[in-house]
From Swiss-Prot:
It holds the Pfam family tRNA-synt_1. It comes from Nanoarchaeum equitans (strain Kin4-M). Its EC number is 6.1.1.4. ATP binds at residue 702. This is Leucine--tRNA ligase.
Length: 977
């Protein structure tokens, strides 16, 4: 018996499971049952995810009496609100509820292997082991990094800690360029993603509806940021004193890191040095010496002093006056080590002049509503030759009292980037081609900006106006010019968000430059190559997911994988940090293989504290001697071997089910971590992804009344109706998966009872005719199609195929005058039972017909019979119309209208009753091919019952009828008498 291991992205247990969860889970459930039906040994486990901020935040809100959170719980029908002050109770309550809901639906989940990701020591030990191994391979480091941050609660905001609409939004890197205004005796710091266009600035934009303030500003560079800059540019491009000395310090630090890599605890020494860097130098040196001696690390005192100097290094710039919007921008600057003191408000900003630091030209400050005062610095430089927003903004200003300024700005326009297919003013070209007439046309302007930026970035070259950078490709010049600006004191590398949003705590988020943060090196080229190798050998449903994942593998840079003040697994070597929710759920599928043992220590006599790295190394990697490990840990050799065998038997995962929104993060991490830790034979084999879920064609929303939990749906419609509707929502495709509540109602009242009735049918023991052979072969074709649909995760197609077969079978029953052959009934019951993966409570037991290939000629019998009956019915209509015409044209027209479905009055129906009820005395069917005889003979009883008259069959070649000439192969002619 072959094994088959099915997993699905486990649910986050901060509420009841809803229909959105079910759309993904039903596909996993159907696949698991299908494989079981086909004889596989199937494992389908399910755990519960609770890592991160959402539960922590919700419990906190309950503890402070937040009315909105309390009302949310009450609407769920929860009465004992007090208990929800405790995050552990949230996890316990909703994981139990999720298990109940999926169990009521009859999911074949092996609950013995269930677990939660928090308050669960064996799982924490497993995650710790994973990160020790990643660190050992050099994929973990500490540094400064821009992350999304909630400044009110001082927490990193990951994808699970924000509204779903903002998942995937990351900090973007740009440059602040300082334009000095003599009028204001202050700098206007303009944020740009395109520093190479600074040579084409004709004005500065500010938002006229925003309050701007004057502030004292000083930038502080801590060692981590200095190190990041050095890493990016290979030197320190800063206008600071002692730059050479700082560069040498960083070089010496790098060399020391390389030397320490030979020691198993070398990285721990560096981490410890950082932890105690705040202590006096003598104490620092003494403590680090002791640590090195204890771990057997050879390090000289001068190297320890180097570490002390390195971790206590920071550089401050000279204080300057800046103009800033009085918005969240100031908070974001502070979180990136800008010291800011607000002096006062700015009364007049529009029409003042500022100097371009590169060209030394004076440019005016002008108003533009498109400037977002909460993004970047709330101040933007205007380059109308290359920015559609800027060009349209100036056109709009020409219509105002600032016409003179706008016209002069447009006269000063110069091309900075040359790109084939555009004039010297590419922005003007694209604005006119897209017929953009106002800065209010945001969507069109965004598309124009993206299109032009992409074209110029990949194909553009700098013109003579770019001074010493003339001739450089844009993609090369961008960072060189950023480096030039920083080196000359004209600007800084800076991070912001493309759009401002709120965290689940309800606060606006910023980009923070976190120091001492822990990162995973997803930027590592060799690691990316391994991930790509895995992808090439995997199956994806639908196939286009493959390219999306490959793009994301290439796109990912290093990832901040630790947060603070959250639920989860503490980082083993730095426990003040917690491994965040996407990063602890990467290889948990391996934990399923042993969870039934580790989650039940009383049964297997396991002390969770003894779950060492050696235990997991043996179980998952086959390293070490189980006898020795048993002696050290007290875990019996037998249990160790059983865990190893369980992993070896079940792994790898044969197919993983997930939702479209997890392509960009979880599924990419899932692949990265598997290839880093496990041998190639244990890499994932397949991934199935479904599109976004809608209910009645709309996104689920409580305000729309279409947000329905699984338990509500079961209570309202019944479990198999819910399963059927969830399966019918869609295939594994990147299109909306729509749960139709009308279909669910119909499933409850019509479809399910109808299917149940089929299982009670009985057949007749009579001679088999051509119609019986047709339906048996039609059912064989059904099974062939079902195999394709089940294998390719297409449950909607499975159901539709059944509906088609159902129509054909009912047609067959009618043709045989409700006396179906017992073999046909036997086959049809198997066809119904093949729906066991979808509706197991109705079907009760599965069935499959094996490898019986359909006979194509017999399949065509049904189509032939259907066409004969339609042609005969049409012929009889024409005869009746002709009979009516012999009486009057009016009656003929009424008969024709009747057959076309027109509404007639009762009087009109009475007038034509004799014609529409007329039945022939005899119907002669003239066929051309002798092979048609048996089929036509077998449908004579049906024709005589439905159409009346006696049916006579004649071979065209033997017929004396004039119409015999009209008979064609498998298209008989009719003579009506």
């Amino acid at each position: 018996m072959k094994k088959f291991f099915v997993t699905a992205a486990f649910p986050y247990v901060n509420g009841y499971l809803h229909l959105g969860h079910l759309v993904t889970y039903i596909k996993a459930e159907i696949t698991a049952r299908y494989k079981k039906m086909r004889g596989y040994d199937v494992l389908f486990p399910m755990g519960f995810h609770a890592t991160g901020a959402p539960i922590y935040a919700a419990a906190y809100k309950v503890s402070i009496g937040d009315p909105k959170q309390i009302e949310t719980l009450k609407k769920m029908g929860i009465k004992d609100i007090e208990k929800f002050k405790d995050p552990a109770y949230w996890v316990e309550y909703f994981s139990k509820a999720a298990k109940e809901d999926l169990s009521k639906l009859g999911f074949m989940i092996e609950w013995e292997r269930s677990f939660t990701t928090v308050f669960n020591k064996p799982f924490h030990k497993f995650v710790e082991w994973q990160y020790h191994r990643l660190r050992e391979k050099g994929y973990i480091y500490r540094g400064a990094h821009p992350i999304v941050w909630d400044p009110k609660v001082n927490m990193v905001i990951g994808d699970h800690d924000r509204p779903d609409d903002y998942a995937g939004i990351r900090p973007i890197e740009g440059v602040i360029i300082k334009f000095y205004s003599k009028d204001l005796d202050a700098y206007l710091p303009a944020f740009t993603l395109r520093p190479e266009t600074v040579f084409g600035v004709v004005n500065i934009w500010v938002n006229p509806e925003t309050e701007y303030v004057l502030a004292k500003v000083k930038k502080v560079f801590y060692v981590y940021e200095l190190y990041s800059l050095y890493k990016k540019f290979g030197r320190l491009p800063l206008n600071i004193e002692n730059r050479d000395k700082l560069e040498k310090l960083i070089q010496d630090y790098n060399n020391l890191l390389d030397r320490l890599k030979q020691y198993e605890k070398g990285i721990d020494l560096i981490a410890h040095a950082e932890e105690i860097a705040y202590k006096p130098k003598e104490e620092f040196v003494k403590e680090l010496k002791e640590f090195a001696e204890k771990e057997g690390i050879k390090i000289e005192e001068k190297d320890i002093e180097l570490l002390y100097e390195y971790y206590n290094t920071k550089v401050e710039t000279q204080e300057e006056k800046w103009i800033l919007p009085n918005t969240i921008v100031i908070e974001e600057l502070k979180n990136q080590d800008f010291e800011i003191e607000i002096i006062g408000k700015i009364d007049k900003l529009i029409k003042t002049l500022a100097e371009n630091p590169v060209t030394k030209e004076l440019v005016p400050v002008l108003p533009a509503k498109f400037v977002d005062p909460e993004v970047g610095t709330g101040i933007v430089m205007s380059v109308p030759s290359h920015a559609p927003y800027d060009y349209v903004g100036l056109l709009d200003l020409i219509k105002t009292e600032l016409k003179e300024f706008a016209e002069q700005a447009l006269k000063n326009v110069r091309p900075v980037v040359k790109v084939e297919g555009f004039s010297e003013m590419p922005a003007k070209d694209i604005v006119e081609s897209m017929n953009i007439t106002s800065q209010e046309e945001r969507d069109k302007l965004e598309k124009a900006t993206q299109r032009l930026y992409s074209k110029e970035f990949y194909h553009g070259v700098l013109t003579e106006h770019a001074q010493q950078f003339q001739g450089l490709p844009v993609k090369e010049a961008k960072m060189k010019i950023a480096e030039y600006l920083m080196e000359n004191g004209y600007g800084y590398i800076y991070y912001t968000l493309p759009v401002r949003f709120k965290s689940r705590y309800g606060n606006k988020v910023v980009v923070k430059l976190v120091k001492g943060q822990w990162f995973i090196k997803y930027s590592d080229k060799q690691w990316k190559e391994l991930a790509h190798k895995a992808v090439e050998n995997m199956k994806f449903y639908p196939p286009q997911v493959k390219e999306l994942i490959k793009e994301k593998i290439d796109w990912y840079d290093d990832w901040a994988f630790t947060h603070q003040k959250e639920l989860g697994t503490a980082l083993p070597w730095d426990p003040k940090w917690v491994i965040e929710s996407l990063s602890d759920s990467t290889i948990y599928t391996a934990y399923y293989t042993i969870a039934h043992i580790l989650q039940h220590p009383e049964k297997y006599n396991i002390d969770w504290d003894k779950l060492t790295i050696d235990v997991f190394d043996y179980v998952f990697l086959g390293k070490g001697d189980p006898k020795e490990i048993a002696k050290k840990t007290g875990i019996s050799e037998e249990i160790l071997k059983e865990m190893r065998n369980q992993f070896e038997y079940w792994y790898p995962v044969d197919i993983r089910f997930s939702a479209q929104d997890l392509i960009a993060n979880h599924l990419v991490f899932y692949i990265f971590h598997h290839v880093a830790i496990f041998p190639e034979s244990k890499w994932p084999r397949g991934i199935a992804v479904s599109g976004f879920v809608t209910v009645n064609g709309e996104k689920m929303s409580k305000s729309k009344g279409n947000f329905i939990t699984i338990r509500e749906a079961i209570q309202r419609y019944g479990r198999d109706a819910v399963r059927l509707a969830a399966a019918y929502a869609g295939n594994a495709e990147l299109v909306d998966q729509n749960i139709d509540l009308e279909f669910m109602e119909k499933a409850k009242n019509e479809i399910i009872p109808r299917i149940e009735s089929y299982l009670d049918m009985e057949g007749y023991d009579r001679d088999e005719n051509s119609l019986d052979k047709w339906i048996v072969n039609r059912i064989r074709l059904y099974f062939k199609k079902l195999e394709e649909y089940y294998e390719n995760i297409r449950p909607r197609d499975v159901i539709n195929e059944f509906f088609k077969l159902e129509n054909d079978f009912n047609f067959y029953r009618a043709l045989v005058l409700e006396k179906p052959h017992k073999r046909a009934i036997e086959y049809f019951k198997k066809a119904v039972k093949a729906l066991w993966p979808i509706i197991p409570h109705v079907v009760r037991e599965p069935a499959w017909i094996g490898k019986e290939e359909p006979d194509e000629p017999w399949i065509r019998v049904g189509q032939y019979v259907d066409q004969v009956i339609k042609d005969l019915a049409n012929t009889l209509k024409l005869v009746r119309i002709s009979m009516a015409r012999n009486v009057s044209h009016r009656l003929a027209d009424l008969v024709k209208l009747y057959y076309e479905g027109a509404k007639l009055t009762e009087e009109e129906k009475e007038e034509i009753r004799e014609f529409i009820e007329w039945k022939p005395v005899r119907i002669k069917i003239i066929y051309k091919n002798p092979s048609e005889f048996d089929i036509l003979r077998d449908i004579i009883p049906y024709i005589e019952k439905v159409f009346g008259g006696k049916v006579v069959l004649e071979l065209a070649s033997e017929s004396k009828e004039e119409k015999a000439k009209r008979a064609k192969e498998f298209k008989p002619a009719f003579v009506i008498e």
